[in-house]
Amino acid sequence: MRNVFFLIILLFSTECLAEEIREIAITIDDLPLVGARMDTPGNRQRATERFAKIIQALTENKVPATGFIIAGSIAKGEMDFLEQFKQAGFMLGNHTYSHYNLNQTSAEKYIADVDRADKKLSLLLTEPKYFRYPYLAEGNKQKKQKVRDYLAEHQYIIAPVTVDSLDFRFNERIYRVPYRERENYIQKIKPEYLAFIWKQTLRAEKRAKGKPVKQILLIHANILNSYLLNDILKMYKEHGYTFISLTDALTNPAPAITFPAITEEKQEHTNDPLEEDLFSIWGD
């Protein structure tokens, strides 16, 4: 009887511990840097400082992040950013050459674009090789299979997303503000942005239905996150999250955001303008 009692206690304790464990991988799309200009010394300096802020936030918080590169967006001088990212110990994956939406592009054109990026990034990509679909768009059944066959043939692992920050809509708002006012504006929208990311995280946890799965956050390399990434990471730590690598997250990932799932969620969240913006760019 005593052994049975201790077994029950052990099982109960293990279950509670599993429920308390919160783990998340941080993934950053659209490297080198969204909206960066390298055409003047001043612009180069600003881009360099913003990218350095991203690396600093990840390093100081000991985050084993993974970045995804748009190969066709690498301007002169930005290859150094990617080298710095890699040398800091972070992983780099393929995000296509031209950032095509597979729902609006043929499989053949899309595969050629991915392959073009694969060749250009061959010396930068880390192992294992990861691929992230732009817009998380995987196309219809036929296109999806063709692209997946290519990715498998070239040893790519698809990097899913379980928490989408939709940060691009917040980032767009920054560019409507005069340059000298942008830093203050970013601080002004910080509470709204952080609250939205946490709201998205809670939704992801709800989809997991109590299972001790691992989350994967999607953000972008942009001006918004160059200033607020440290705050995002602090928020997750305050809520008990531990940062893990994408490789670790894929051992037991939370339910990924997919087209069917997002289409269904639209029925529940049609009052959210940020979500409506996202749905509007995803059509088949």
Label the model's feature ranges:
Residues M1-V4:
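Positively charged n-region of N-terminal signal peptides that target proteins for export
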Residues F6-L10:
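Hydrophobic helical h-region of N-terminal Sec-dependent signal peptides
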Residues K53-I55, N94-Y97, K120-L121, I158-P160, ...:
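Short, surface-exposed, polar/charged, turn-prone segments marking secondary-structure boundaries
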